[in-house]
Amino acid sequence: MKVRIAVVGKLDGFIKEGIKHYEKFLRRFCKLEVLEIKRVHRGSIEEIVRKETEDLANRILLGSFVMVMDRRGEEVSSEEFADFLKDLEMKGKDITILIGGPHGLNEEIFAKAHRVFSLSKMTFTHGMTVLIVLEQIFRAFKIIHGENYHY
């Protein structure tokens, strides 16, 4: 299974270290790819969001299950997320996870999404969202394989 996370914005050094940490743990479960999508700085907020969303959409893996992370999405437990991931794994599906920048995402991307998830009603930076998503993916695979995930 391939998991691609496309995120708007440059990721800080400590976030990149966290990504390396989870890449090491996830290596035996999936092939992970994290793509930084350049932020747009010119134009109205609406134009910026449209362009950033378009750039994200262009990074969707062909034939993959598309997940969007958005505070308006569905909140699920770690066990429910593990069941969801197991189902995709059994179907042989790759996953593309899209994370917007500070101004959010254009509504058009939600039409491309198969599912929209929320980590919380709180708002997180795009970098922290990446790390939390990676932790939940790792936790889900540990649950799927019946391994202890409290480390």
Curated annotation (Swiss-Prot):
Keyword check for Phosphoprotein: no
Annotated transmembrane regions: none
Cellular component aspect of the GO annotation: cytoplasm
Disulfide bond sites: none
Recorded catalytic activity of this chain's protein: pseudouridine(1915) in 23S rRNA + S-adenosyl-L-methionine = N(3)-methylpseudouridine(1915) in 23S rRNA + S-adenosyl-L-homocysteine + H(+)
Gene Ontology molecular-function annotations: rRNA (pseudouridine-N3-)-methyltransferase activity
Binding site for S-adenosyl-L-methionine: G100, L119, S120, K121, M122, T123, F124
CDD domains hit by this protein: RlmH-like (cd18081)
InterPro entries associated with the record: Alpha/beta_knot_MTases, RlmH-like, tRNA_m1G_MTases_N
Keywords linked to the UniProt accession: Cytoplasm, Methyltransferase, rRNA processing, S-adenosyl-L-methionine, Transferase
Enzyme Commission designation: 2.1.1.177
Pfam families, per database record: SPOUT_MTase
Protein biosynthesis recorded as keyword: no
Major localization class: cytoplasm
Family assignment from sequence similarity: Belongs to the RNA methyltransferase RlmH family.
Subunit structure: Homodimer.
Protein name listed in UniProt: Ribosomal RNA large subunit methyltransferase H
